[in-house]
Amino acid sequence: MSMSDPIADMLTRIRNAQQVDKVTVSMPSSKLKAAIAAVLQDEGYIDGFEVKGTQAKPELEITLKYYAGRPVIERIERVSRPGLRIYKGRSNIPQVMNGLGVAIVSTSRGVMTDRKARANGVGGEVLCYVA
């Protein structure tokens, strides 16, 4: 069975793993998933990630982060999806929780946070919100 939305699958795996206090979570890898994981690591939402396996079937392993026994990621939700893509210009990129969370945006200059996109003066597809 083909997966219609691999990014939503990635976010759901992270959410489910944190609900049962898993240390790591694995999923099929792609360049976009690795870029999203890199943004999550830069922002301090995960401890790290690693691409494992063969080139034919790479696996992305994410090490989750907890603080005082609770997951660091309180909320992670998909915004743009295959049935309804959400694109925002550089002046319309949304803030999450008045700047306490991040929106992950896919731009022509790569995957970045809403703050970096505004600083670089680029818009793009709003992939997800993380808080």
UniProtKB/Swiss-Prot annotation:
Top-level taxon of the source organism: Bacteria
Gene3D superfamilies: 3.30.1370.30, 3.30.1490.10
GO cellular component: ribonucleoprotein complex; ribosome
Nucleus as UniProt keyword: no
A GO biological process held by the record: translation
Single GO MF annotation: rRNA binding
Swiss-Prot/TrEMBL keywords: Ribonucleoprotein, Ribosomal protein, RNA-binding, rRNA-binding
Pfam family membership, one: Ribosomal_S8
Subunit structure of this chain's protein: Part of the 30S ribosomal subunit. Contacts proteins S5 and S12.
Family statement drawn from the similarity comment of this UniProt entry: Belongs to the universal ribosomal protein uS8 family.
Function summary: One of the primary rRNA binding proteins, it binds directly to 16S rRNA central domain where it helps coordinate assembly of the platform of the 30S subunit.
Protein name per its UniProtKB record: Small ribosomal subunit protein uS8
Species of origin: Bordetella petrii (strain ATCC BAA-461 / DSM 12804 / CCUG 43448)
Organism lineage: Bacteria, Pseudomonadati, Pseudomonadota, Betaproteobacteria, Burkholderiales
